[in-house]
Structure formats: structure tokens, C-alpha cells
């Protein structure tokens, strides 16, 4: 199917593209939950005995995902966006097969661990190159009144798929004929199959070219202009600081599952249910989040997600003492903790990106999107810090380390404008 469609209306194919993008987003989100940080942190600690290595693993995944987004900020002048993100999507998703092949063909556990590092470094690396052109494609292909619905529906259907994958994770990890580490390799195999299925949907997208494009702007010149944009726009500066402070949740949340297994006595085979709880939160929250996005109430969305993340961290903080004292209702703390985390995580993605879409024009938009997302690299070291903390200090200190900056992000969010013009 050609991407070169000479039509004047950029939204001419919006219904077709809306459906295909929703289908790919659903299978993508379902697939990535099979290698959620909660799952792979347990795998790595079981394979290596090192919480530090588990933190490094998450740091690598985050860093290599966000840096390419800064290198993609020159897509605003490109007439076609589909060919850019589809190319990188195909390459990245194929990289998952490295871990699959090593798990079932190699006998050395160290080699298998190395293959997981390689697969989950290359996949997010190439996937990072898709984010800015994908968002640009969404903006040019889907009318503004439908974008909140699109993002909300993507989150909702994806969360439903993730709930199903949570049960699948539990089934695979408890399968008597799948021993460690083949059970984790099977999870990645299913993930790869789903990912490659999604590529088929992307190939049938249609795209009208942008008018009056300027492809001659050098990437280096765009990068040099980023400090000026940040310096001159107070809202951008505040949004960056809010995002950085909020992201400090990642000191703690990668270790939620490990905390439940090692400190609260939850069976390892039950970690799949953690994904179910987390994705149930995303599913339930997707409807109010979509409504707020359509109305442009991004300040309210930021504040809501911050409060939910704070509540999740506070529940984690009291869970240890509650379980030790066998307090009434203690067994509900873990499901609620993951539920609130899932709801908050999806809301922050929508709120920040909708703010950027609302305050920038076509030329500035990819620059801001790439910059905002690349700043997550600053906080990518936080899971390593979390791994060090729990190696020597109580989990309670770990959770406090996240709670304080999240409170700071809430205070800053109160000073943002309620709606965008």
C-alpha cells in the first residue's frame, strides 16, 4: 500500500488510520506487559542474585529508549512520517528473537542473561526512534477532537490486553513442563509474535504528505535551539521540572514485585497477577483520562495522576508493617498498590504529551516532544539507586525516596494553567 497519497485533506483517512493504530497499540501494549519490569526484575534476581543488576537493566532500557527521541526531532520537516516509524518498528521488534533463541538453544545461564540484556537494549533503542514520528503521524492523521478518544481508547484496550497477559504470565510461570529460564523465554516468544503481528497493521496505514515542508534544517541546529526554547517558555520549564520530579517514582516501582515476593511472602508464580492489577488500573482510568484530554483539562489530569501515584507509594510504605501485624485488609494492599500505579502511569503519559501538543506548532512540536521524552534519561539512573538502597537498607526508605519528589511535582502542577488555548 503506497504511503504517497496526493490528497489535500490530511484527515482524509482518519477513520482507517484510527482503527489500524488502535489495533497495533492494543497488541503492542499487550505484548510489552509480558516483559514488564516487575517480571524481568524477578527473572534477573533469580538468575544472578543481584538487585543492583536488576536496577542497571531497567536503567539501560529507559536510557536507550529516550535518547533516540532527541535524535528524531527533525521529522517535523519531513513530508511523510509513516515510512520512518514503520522501518524502525520492524527492526526493533525482530530484536526480541535474540533472547528467544538464546533461551532455548543455549545451556549457559550467563549467556541467556546476556541475551536478555541485548534484546531489551536493542528493542527499546530502535523503538525510541519511532516515538516522535509516530506522534507526529497521529497529530496529522487524527482530528484534534478525536485525539483524546484515540489515546484513551488505546490505553483502555491495551490495558484489557495486558490484563489477559497477566493471566497468561501466571499460567506460563507455573507450567510444570516449563522450567527456569525457559518459562521466561516463552514469555518473550509470545511477546515477539504479538509485536510482529502489529507490524502488519502498520503497513496498511495511509498518509497524505505535509505541505510546505522544509527538510534542509540540520539536526545539530535544532539541538542547539533547544536551550533557547526552554529559556523563553516558562510553561515548558515548569512542565519539565514536574515531569522530572514525578519520574522519581521509578526509584521504587521497578521493585514492587520483588518487594512482594521477598518481603511479604508472595509466591513468585503469582507475579502475573500484579500485571492484572496494574492493567486494571490503566483500563478503569483510561475513560476519565480520555474525557479530560478531550476537554483540554491537562492540569487536572496531571494532578490526578500525581495523587494516585502518591497513594500507591504510601500503600507500599505501610504494606510491610501491615503484613507483619496481620492487619485486617492487609491482603488488599498489593492489588490496590499496583492498581493505582497503573492508573497513574498512563495518565502522566497523556497529560504531558497533550500539553506539548497544545503549546507548540508543527515545527516546534517534534522538538519539544523529543526534548521532553529525552529528559527521562536524567532519571533513568534511579532504578540503579533503588537497587542499591534495597541491597543495604529497608524498603521503607526506598519508598520515601520516591514519595518526597512526587509531592514536589504536585505542588508545581498547581501553578500550571488549567486549560490550553
Task: Kindly give the residue locations of the regions a language model identified.
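Helix-loop boundary and gating motifs at the non-cytosolic
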Residues: 2-68, 72, 158, 235-275
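Transmembrane alpha-helix termini and helix-breaking/packing motifs in multi-pass membrane transporters
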Residues: 41-46, 73-77, 100-107, 162-182, ...
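Loop-to-transmembrane helix entry/capping segments in MFS-fold secondary transporters
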Residues: 51-52, 142-153, 268-269, 362-372
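Helix-to-loop junctions at the C-terminal end of transmembrane segments
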Residues: 68-81, 173, 284-298, 390-391
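Cytoplasmic membrane-interface "Motif A"-like loop-to-helix N-cap segments
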Residues: 77-93, 295-309
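C-terminal ends and interior cores of transmembrane alpha-helices
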Residues: 90-110, 308-327
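Intracellular juxtamembrane helix-capping segments at the cytosolic ends
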Residues: 127-142, 347-360
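Flexible cytoplasmic inter-helical loops of multi-pass small-molecule transporters
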Residues: 206-225
Amino acid at each position: 500500500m503506497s504511503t504517497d497519497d496526493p490528497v489535500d485533506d490530511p484527515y482524509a483517512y482518519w477513520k482507517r488510520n484510527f482503527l489500524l493504530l488502535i489495533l497495533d497499540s492494543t497488541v503492542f501494549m499487550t505484548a510489552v506487559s509480558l516483559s514488564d519490569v516487575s517480571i524481568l526484575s524477578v527473572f534477573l534476581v533469580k538468575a544472578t542474585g543481584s538487585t543492583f543488576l536488576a536496577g542497571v537493566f531497567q536503567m539501560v532500557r529507559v536510557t536507550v529508549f529516550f535518547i533516540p527521541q532527541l535524535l528524531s526531532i527533525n521529522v517535523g520537516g519531513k513530508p511523510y512520517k509513516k515510512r520512518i516509524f514503520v522501518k524502525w518498528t520492524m527492526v526493533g521488534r525482530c530484536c526480541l528473537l535474540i533472547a528467544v533463541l538464546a533461551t532455548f538453544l543455549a545451556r549457559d545461564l550467563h549467556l541467556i542473561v546476556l541475551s536478555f540484556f541485548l534484546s531489551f537494549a536493542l528493542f527499546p533503542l530502535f523503538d525510541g526512534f519511532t516515538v516522535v514520528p509516530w506522534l507526529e503521524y497521529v497529530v496529522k492523521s487524527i482530528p484534534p477532537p478525536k485525539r483524546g478518544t484515540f489515546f484513551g481508547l488505546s490505553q483502555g484496550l491495551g490495558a484489557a490486553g495486558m490484563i489477559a497477559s497477566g493471566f497468561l504470565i501466571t499460567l506460563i510461570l507455573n507450567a510444570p513442563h516449563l522450567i527456569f529460564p525457559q518459562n521466561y523465554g516463552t514469555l518473550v516468544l509470545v511477546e515477539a509474535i504479538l509485536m510482529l503481528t502489529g507490524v502488519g497493521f502498520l503497513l496498511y496505514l495511509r498518509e497524505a504528505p505535509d505541505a510546505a515542508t522544509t527538510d534542509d534544517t540540520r539536526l545539530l541546529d535544532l539541538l542547539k535551539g533547544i536551550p533557547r526554547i526552554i529559556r523563553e517558555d516558562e510553561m515548558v520549564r515548569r512542565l519539565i521540572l514536574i515531569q522530572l520530579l514525578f519520574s522519581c517514582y521509578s526509584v521504587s516501582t521497578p521493585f514492587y514485585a520483588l518487594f512482594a515476593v521477598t518481603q511479604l511472602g508472595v509466591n513468585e508464580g503469582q507475579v502475573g497477577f500484579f500485571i492484572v492489577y496494574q492493567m486494571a488500573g490503566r483500563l478503569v482510568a483510561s475513560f476519565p483520562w480520555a474525557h479530560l484530554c478531550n476537554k483540554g483539562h491537562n492540569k487536572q489530569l496531571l494532578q490526578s495522576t500525581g495523587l494516585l501515584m502518591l497513594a500507591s507509594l504510601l500503600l507500599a510504605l505501610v504494606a510491610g508493617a501491615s503484613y507483619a501485624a496481620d492487619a485486617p485488609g492487609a491482603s488488599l494492599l498489593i492489588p490496590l498498590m499496583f492498581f493505582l500505579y497503573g492508573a497513574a502511569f498512563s495518565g502522566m503519559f497523556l497529560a504531558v504529551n497533550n500539553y506539548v501538543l497544545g503549546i507548540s506548532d508543527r515545527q516546534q512540536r517534534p522538538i519539544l516532544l523529543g526534548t521532553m521524552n529525552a529528559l527521562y534519561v536524567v532519571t533513568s539512573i534511579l532504578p540503579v539507586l533503588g537497587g542499591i538502597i534495597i541491597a543495604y537498607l529497608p524498603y521503607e526508605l526506598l519508598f520515601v525516596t520516591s514519595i518526597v519528589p512526587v509531592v514536589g511535582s504536585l505542588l508545581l502542577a498547581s501553578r500550571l494553567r488549567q486549560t490550553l488555548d
